[in-house]
Amino acid sequence: MGDIQSISRRAFVFGSAALAGGIAFGSYSNAESVATSGSGNPLASGLGPNSVTFNPWVEISPEKITLIAQHADIGQGVGSVQPIMIAEEMDLDPGPFEIRFAGPSPAYFNTGFADEFAPFLAADQSPAAEAARAAALESLRKSGLQMTGGSSTVPDTYEKLRIAGAAARETLKAAAAKRSGVPVADIRTQSGHVILPDGTKIPYSNYQRKPRRFRRCRK
């Protein structure tokens, strides 16, 4: 598991640009707020009354956690590697989550082609090369090009899915801190639970929009 601070500046810039307007960072949509959120999150419009979504790749309901695979699996196993990258950053064990393939949406545009479209070697990180990649990325964002191919799945998703998972985890911790009165620095996560200093374990699936309190469980 990583954290947002440990992700490189280039990864952060490219990843956050791919997160449909930054909706993964400290915010969420739910069924009550969809009409006014303007988040651009394709998961927001289909949420149940007690479900939340932090970004286009994470949806949580009282019954399950759903992770979205935006690239089609055409035999290479990318349908598994994408949600596993999110799960690693969210502190989710393999298995206790549902994998769903993404529907059509500009939020899932393929950033992996940005390097290919720029006339520079991949190892070239000069200002000119970075500017060309940024321009290519902006062009891809505007076109909303959502496709699988060219061995682009991991280059496209590795950074932004890590950021999406880490941001969802930190948002859950912040919510637990607000509702428990415990400083967020004293809260940790493990195996799909937020854990308070006294050992109280709060399942991620208990996260709701306006609960009076988290439902808690002990070890």
Describe each model-derived feature in a short phrase:
Residues 2, 65-85, 95-166, 184-216:
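Short, surface-exposed loop/turn segments at secondary-structure boundaries that line and modulate
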Residues 2-20:
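N-terminal secretory signal peptides and thylakoid transit peptides that target proteins
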Residues 5-6, 26-62, 189, 194:
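C-terminal segment of N-terminal export signals and the immediately downstream linker at the start
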Residues 90-91:
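Catalytic phosphate/nucleotide-handling subdomain of diverse soluble enzymes
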